[in-house]
Amino acid sequence: MADFAATDQLLTREFNVSARRIEGPELCSLDPSLKPGLAGAFLYETDTMLRPERLCREWRERLMCRGVRFVESCEVLSAEKEADGIECVITSKGPMTADGYVLATGARSGQLGHLFGCYLPIQPGKGYSVTMPRPAICPSYPMLFPEHRVGVTPFQEGYRLGSMMEFVGFDEQIPSSRVEQLKRSAEPYLKQPHTDGQSETWYGWRPMTWDSLPAIGPASGLRNAYVATGHNMLGLSMAPATGKMIAAMIAGKGPELDPSPFDPARFARA
């Protein structure tokens, strides 16, 4: 518990985010889904959870109502540049022009950075999840078990385990061994860590950077091109702040947060 207490102290000191420390004997009273004998936990009562697929669907619907147009199954082939900016991007559905261009293509950003004249050493970090019916004794809270690097998310209609970090390129397979390993990871902590019914497996590629910081800011030498990628394992958490920073830059305003640590040009200087 000492290591986690140090993390809690840092979060309290730097961000005014503190947790309630719960010793082992109290855990089962807090959440009966937990096994007896655990050392303890830190409860961050302001934390919450969401289903990313539903959030993205809702974003899409709301943006379309505001006039945003989504062009799907469209491959970006190249970018035509003028003196100090991008004139248009050439796609499989024809040229597209805009006042500003933002490269926000997640784990694929390393393959597309050259369009903006950027060196982006972003690697795909593959993770897995399995979503299944809720167990009879289901956790009441979303939980992280750092020793086994597994996250537990209880939904109204289901229950999800997520974990893993593999550097295997853009591999699209979901090995059954990984799914079983994921299920086993929660067994030391939960009375009913998984259920038998119909389950849904998933994989995704996280955009990993070698210094664990995202790349947010102008593309070097281009007045109308910006980068917003490389958020590692915190893309959803950092999305709102990233959007505000990029919007401020495009509008010619100073962002509220110092963007220099996230400068995409740092990779070229390394």
Q: Where do the protein language model's features map onto the residues?
A:
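Dinucleotide-binding Rossmann-like beta1-alpha1 core, especially the glycine-rich loop
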Residues: M1-G24, A186-E187
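C-terminal catalytic lobe of FAD-dependent flavoproteins
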Residues: F15, P52, P146-E147, D171-Q173, ...
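Mid-domain beta-loop-alpha active-site segment that forms a flexible
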Residues: L43-E61, A107-R108, R178-S185, G235, ...
